[in-house]
């Protein structure tokens, strides 16, 4: 039936003002939603005594964050904790406080390895960052694992590292095959971020902060 037809019918109206099905939290949520409808018959009604539980599934909201820059503000830290968990599940790259969602050391190692295998020369700090995540004895010799007693002012190329500094990982291998010591959950997350075409060389588009 059309709502306006029922609303305009003549007769006696009896309001059922007690719900024996909806708990308190659901009742409050329902009232908040229904209040958005302007042309309606208002009524006062109560819930049952139990509190109940409201679970928010953020998939549709997260879809809106696929593009553009976002600053997400929350009054309570626990709300950001939940959002942060969901952003990680769905592979979003974000920043909270002074840290990004990708571990700093892992982030540096990935970028450094990708630079080296593409022919760029990098400094000793960059070499150490990715050597740390290469399996000793299989991808880099134990002698050079920590790159001690080497020229700290020098720039290093892939060919130089192979010939003189114990590297044996094929440069055709992407970071997730070369840097096998990155913990699997962290590597899986970074790969999910990259599948979203996020640019991890730049600051994250999404920033989380408390008010």
What do these predicted regions represent?
Residues 1-50, 67, 71-86, 97-104, ...:
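Conserved helicase motor core of SF1/SF2 NTP-dependent helicases
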Residues 4, 59-63, 195-201:
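Short, flexible, glycine/charge-rich loop motifs used to bind or transfer phosphoryl groups or to couple energy/partner
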Residues 13, 54-56, 94:
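Generic structural signal for residues in well-ordered beta-strands
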Residues 24-27, 77-211:
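Core RecA-like ATPase module of SF1/SF2 helicases and allied nucleic-acid translocases
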Residues 51-61:
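Short acidic-hydrophobic, aromatic-tinged amphipathic segments that line or gate anion-handling sites
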Residues 58, 74, 210:
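Pocket-edge structural micro-motifs
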């Amino acid at each position: 039936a059309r709502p306006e037809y029922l609303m305009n019918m003549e007769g006696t109206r009896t309001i059922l003002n007690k719900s024996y099905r909806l708990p308190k939290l659901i009742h409050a949520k329902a009232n908040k939603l229904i209040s958005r409808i302007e042309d309606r018959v208002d009524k006062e009604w109560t819930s049952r005594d139990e509190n109940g539980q409201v679970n928010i599934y953020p998939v549709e909201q997260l879809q809106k964050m696929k593009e553009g820059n976002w600053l997400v503000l929350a009054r309570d830290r626990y709300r950001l904790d939940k959002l942060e968990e969901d952003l990680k599940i769905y592979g979003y790259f974000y920043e909270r406080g002074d840290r990004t969602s990708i571990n700093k050391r892992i982030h540096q190692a990935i970028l450094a390895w990708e630079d080296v295998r593409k022919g760029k020369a990098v400094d000793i700090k960059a070499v150490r960052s990715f050597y740390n995540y290469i399996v000793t004895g299989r991808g880099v010799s134990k002698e050079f694992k920590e790159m001690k007693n080497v020229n700290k002012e020098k720039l290093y190329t892939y060919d130089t590292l192979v010939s003189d500094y114990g590297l044996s990982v094929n440069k055709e291998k992407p970071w997730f095959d070369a840097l096998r010591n990155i913990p699997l959950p962290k590597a899986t997350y970074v790969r999910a971020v990259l599948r979203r075409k996020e640019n991890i060389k730049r600051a994250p588009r999404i920033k989380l902060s408390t008010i």
